[in-house]
Amino acid sequence: MRVLAAMSGGVDSAVAAARAVDAGHDVTGVHLALSRSPESDRTGARGCCTLEDARDARRAADVLGIPFYVWDLAERFETEVIDQFVESYAAGRTPNPCVRCNERIKFAAVLDRALALGFDAVVTGHHARLDPDGTLRRSVDPAKDQSYVLGTLRPEQLGAARFPLGDSTKAQVRREAAARGLAVADKPDSHDICFISGGDTGGWLRERIGSRPGPIVDSRTGQTLGEHDGTFAFTVGQRRGLRLGHPAPDGRPRYVLDISPVTSTVTVGPAEELDIRRLVADRAAWPHEGVVTCQAQVRAHGGVVAAEAEARGDDLVVTLDTPVRGTAAGQAVVLYDGDRVLGGGHIRVTAA
């Protein structure tokens, strides 16, 4: 089989490519240049897609003895991921750029080009498992499981994907990398949004959206408690950094309950007002009909809650057995049956 190994410059993608070689496949490595002005070096776990990452990917390919190329997808990444990220925050939503990147870049732009060039599949270093029939499952390493950020992929995308690391823990992957002589064996994982290398999401958004001041309002009294520079700096469920001038009468902490970019108003209140029991999402990847009993996950590293899901036209309606807090429009909801991914979508509406 001819496979294209997406090599980020990290340990996971390097070992995934190595395992594809061991499996007897005809492997070609590719590094995705996703920034128009990449930084020279990474700063710990901050960011990725630097020139250092490209060099690390090339060195790994050389050790494996496979051809290596760099594909410039910076323009498409900016349009499909970065611009959408900015637009979402400007509209009061909370997007997950990793989910979006998988949908539009790795398993769309890259996969489409790979198939057009005669490759049979794309190999990545994601920690998830794929059954022979294309069923997506959680990784055996719960701490590193990435099935959530893959949960909105369509069956045809998963059908041409390969995830060789799904049956291994991260510790096993690092030991294997060291044994293979891969210099990235101890390279730190990237934890932050890859295109915001400094980690200051609020400041980064302010540069692109501009200051849009408005009031911070108490949900129960309607009292203005403070001012903000822009709703983009807030997410539903946020507690820190509110800079409120008036403590709550009962002394309890306040959380962001609602964000209204139209009026530039941020509404805050007690934790119990964050409780959500019903979600309406788009039907990004939901092939099932009727009511399906399942478990719902709404954050990349969050827990699951028992739920029922039902397709209604283009909508996916999810009713939760117990409420979850801090869930916002823009997040992905991924639905499971045990470790098996049933599908998912992007949340548009939440309700108590």
Swiss-Prot record:
UniProt-listed Pfam families: tRNA_Me_trans, tRNA_Me_trans_C, tRNA_Me_trans_M
What residues make up the catalytic site? C101, C194
Q: Which domain of life is it from?
A: Bacteria
Gene3D superfamilies to which the protein is assigned, alphabetical: Adenine nucleotide alpha hydrolases-like domains (2.30.30.280), HUPs (3.40.50.620), Translation factors (2.40.30.10)
* Annotated site, Interaction with tRNA, chain positions: H126, Q331
Gene Ontology CC entries for this record: cytoplasm
User: Keyword set for this entry?
Assistant: ATP-binding, Cytoplasm, Disulfide bond, Nucleotide-binding, RNA-binding, Transferase, tRNA processing, tRNA-binding
Q: Which GO terms describe its molecular function?
A: ATP binding; tRNA binding; tRNA-uridine 2-sulfurtransferase activity
Question: What ranges does the record give for the region Interaction with tRNA, renumbered to this chain?
Answer: 144-146
Q: InterPro entries of this UniProt entry?
A: MnmA-like (IPR004506), MnmA-like_C (IPR046885), MnmA-like_central (IPR046884), MnmA-like_central_sf (IPR023382), Rossmann-like_a/b/a_fold (IPR014729)
Residues recorded as binding ATP, renumbered to this chain, are A6, M7, S8, G9, G10, V11, D12, S13, L32, G125
Q: Which reaction does it catalyse?
A: S-sulfanyl-L-cysteinyl-[protein] + uridine(34) in tRNA + AH2 + ATP = 2-thiouridine(34) in tRNA + L-cysteinyl-[protein] + A + AMP + diphosphate + H(+)
Gene Ontology biological process: tRNA wobble position uridine thiolation
Which top-level enzyme class is recorded in the Swiss-Prot or TrEMBL entry? transferase
Disulfide bridge map = C101-C194
The record's subcellular location field reads: Cytoplasm
List its EC numbers.
2.8.1.13
State where it is primarily located. cytoplasm
Query: What HAMAP family would the database entry show?
Result: tRNA_thiouridyl_MnmA
Q: Which family does it belong to?
A: Belongs to the MnmA/TRMU family.
Q: State its role.
A: Catalyzes the 2-thiolation of uridine at the wobble position (U34) of tRNA, leading to the formation of s(2)U34.
Q: What is this protein called?
A: tRNA-specific 2-thiouridylase MnmA
Report the source organism.
Frankia alni (strain DSM 45986 / CECT 9034 / ACN14a)
